[in-house]
Structures are given as structure tokens and as C-alpha cells.
Amino acid sequence: AEVINSLTATKKQELLQELFGSDANSISISYLRISIGASDLNASVFSYNDLPNGQVDLSQTSFSLAPDMTNLIPLLREILVINPNIKIMAVPWSAPSWMKTNYTTVGSSLSPIFYNSYAQYFVKYIQAMKTQGITIDAICPQNEPLHDGNNPSMLMTAANQISFIKKLGPAFQ
């Protein structure tokens, strides 16, 4: 989003039309995959609930889309004007560091004591994006769940995913 937003207005519109438009000169992308919080492609690492070391926010009261309000969210809105039927999948690269066993965004895993809170993080994300006019059509519990070497990243084995999903599903009810 940051790179696309750095283009001139004309070049940006040309690119967005070429990618998401429906005319003969467009490739008509119909499905996007975006990160929940930062990915390894972002200029800086962030979650939507960053806290100082030692603090926790079980109910996600400090949750905020602020890190993406400058680039990603405005860009998604522009894409939706071009293609209002586009489907969006959202996937995290890491839980907020305070939820992880090593308290950092690199590697490690989600601490089981925070499964319920992390499920609420997903719910808050879907709700917050909806208030921005962006519908998230699908989610995944973790990007590259067995690769924990990027910044951000998080190991989430199949067994961990099963345990977490058992909390995630009911959180959406």
C-alpha cells in the first residue's frame, strides 16, 4: 500500500484500474490477501494492540487500526470503488507481542493463556474494518504457521491452530 500510495495520482489510478478494473486492459483481480497487523513487507512492525512490555489487554480495549489508516485502509477504499465485489482475506503474521511466549514479534508462539483474547483481537479487527467500509470475507489463523524466522512471524503448529480455532469460532457468535 505504501509503495502504491507513493505514485503520482495519475499513475496510481492507472495501476489500480489495470489491476482491479473490469475493462479489456485490466487483469480484474477479484481476491486480495492482506495482513492483520504488519507483515514482513511493511516498513515497520506493528499490531493493532501494541502495549509496553509487561502490560496486557485481555478485552482489546486498546485495539486500533491507526497504523493502517494512512496507507492500507484508504487504498482498500479506492480499490472498492473500482471493484465493489472484490473479496478480501486477512491473515496475521504475528499476534501482539504481549500475547507471545517470547514477548516479541519475531518467532515464538501464541501463549495458550491468550487464546481467548487473540480470538477477540480477530473479532475487533473484523468489526473495525467494517466500520471503515471494508468487509473481510475470510480469515486464516496464521501466515506461514511453521515459519517463524521473519519479523513479524509466529509459530503455530496444527495442534495450536486447532486449539485456537476452538476459541475463535465461538468468539464470532
Predicted regions and their residues:
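Gly/Pro-rich turn-and-neighbor structural signature
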Residues: 150-173
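Alpha/beta-hydrolase-fold catalytic nucleophile elbow
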Residues: 91, 142-143
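N-terminal catalytic cores of secreted or lumenal carbohydrate-active enzymes
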Residues: 1-136, 162, 166
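Active-site-proximal beta-alpha loop/turn segments in soluble metabolic enzymes
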Residues: 100-111, 143-156
